[in-house]
């Protein structure tokens, strides 16, 4: 690494604001020049050091993957498990307040395993502690997504190599694992809880459950079964609300039809991935 690029780089404090969708969250944002440094840091170094070693079952914030592919991957796993086991069990895990509870010292130690360049280590520490606290990553920073993925890659590797779980999928802090029996599901979940608490200082929240395969699983905004993938009712309600809001904006002259359609086009992929017949027609029945 060229030391000239980092020796005079000072990462300054970040600003914060709140968003209410999909729930109340504090978003912390670095100044423009720091955001340039963050992108350079992730794209030129973290990709090389860490992303190549990620499990194939990790889907968040990775090129060529994403939420929709994660859902399709879970569905393919379910089809396969139905063929080999017929009935099986689903462990659905969700980490409690994930970004807020990441232990920076543990994360830094994980990063140090692969990063040996002293200048890059210095910059890593500067970025990691830029908000002045020892626990939690700022939601909104480009580096936070990468750091968060690296942190739970520890869980991916534990499930794969220690627990010998073949059928898992993780989208950031949402995790699905498929196992043969209820007994195995309980045993594996208990081991995962212990690993998260002892090694990463994390806990699973109350959404974490064990289901029979016939119930399917809620994951990344979809209700997934082996041969059906539907948008959850909560997602449908949000889409309907957005469509009505845009109709009102257009009627009041606050937005053009072209602008409204451009906004809606971003949601069509979300709908088209699912096996939801006529939903698009119902949502967009009214001409905007």
Tell me the role of every PLM-derived stretch.
Residues 30, 35, 39, 186-187, ...:
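Right-hand nucleic-acid polymerase module
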Residues 44, 48, 154, 158, ...:
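Active-site catalytic microenvironments for nucleophilic, acid-base chemistry
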Residues 41, 189-192, 196:
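PAPS/PAP-binding and catalytic site of the sulfotransferase fold
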Residues 3-4, 72-172, 176-192, 207, ...:
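Conserved polymerase palm-domain catalytic core
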Residues 46-53, 159, 275-278:
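Short helix-capping/linker segments at secondary-structure and domain boundaries
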Residues 18-20, 50-54, 89, 171, ...:
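Short acidic (Asp/Glu) and glycine-rich catalytic loops that position anionic groups and cofactors
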Residues 1-107, 115:
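Conserved two-metal-ion catalytic palm core of "right-hand" nucleic acid polymerases
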Residues 11-18, 52-58, 86-92, 122-127, ...:
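Short coil/turn segments at secondary-structure boundaries
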């Amino acid at each position: 690494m060229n030391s000239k690029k980092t020796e005079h780089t000072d990462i300054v404090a970040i600003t914060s604001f709140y968003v209410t969708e999909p729930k109340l969250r504090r978003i912390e944002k670095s100044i423009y020049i720091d955001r340039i440094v963050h992108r350079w840091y992730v794209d030129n170094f973290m990709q090389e050091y860490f992303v190549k070693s990620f499990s194939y079952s990790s889907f968040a914030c990775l090129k060529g993957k994403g939420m929709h592919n994660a859902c399709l991957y879970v569905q393919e796993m379910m089809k396969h498990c139905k063929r080999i086991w017929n009935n099986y069990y689903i462990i659905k895990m969700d980490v409690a307040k994930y970004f807020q509870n990441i232990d920076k010292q543990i994360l830094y130690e994980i990063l140090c395993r692969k990063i040996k360049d002293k200048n890059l280590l210095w910059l890593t520490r500067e970025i990691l502690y830029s908000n002045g606290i020892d626990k939690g990553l700022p939601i909104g920073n480009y580096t936070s997504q990468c750091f968060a993925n690296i942190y739970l890659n520890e869980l991916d590797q534990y499930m794969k190599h220690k627990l010998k779980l073949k059928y898992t999928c993780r989208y950031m802090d949402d995790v699905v694992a498929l196992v043969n029996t209820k007994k195995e599901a309980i045993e594996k979940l208990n081991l995962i809880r212990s690993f998260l608490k002892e090694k990463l200082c994390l806990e699973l929240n109350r959404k974490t459950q064990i289901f029979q395969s016939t119930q399917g699983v809620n994951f990344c905004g979809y209700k997934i079964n082996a041969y059906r993938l539907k948008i959850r009712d909560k997602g449908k309600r949000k889409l309907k609300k957005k469509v009505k809001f845009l109709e009102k904006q257009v009627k009041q002259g606050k937005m053009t039809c072209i602008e409204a359609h451009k906004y809606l086009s971003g949601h069509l992929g979300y709908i088209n991935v699912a096996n939801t017949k006529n939903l698009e027609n119902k949502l967009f029945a009214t001409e905007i």
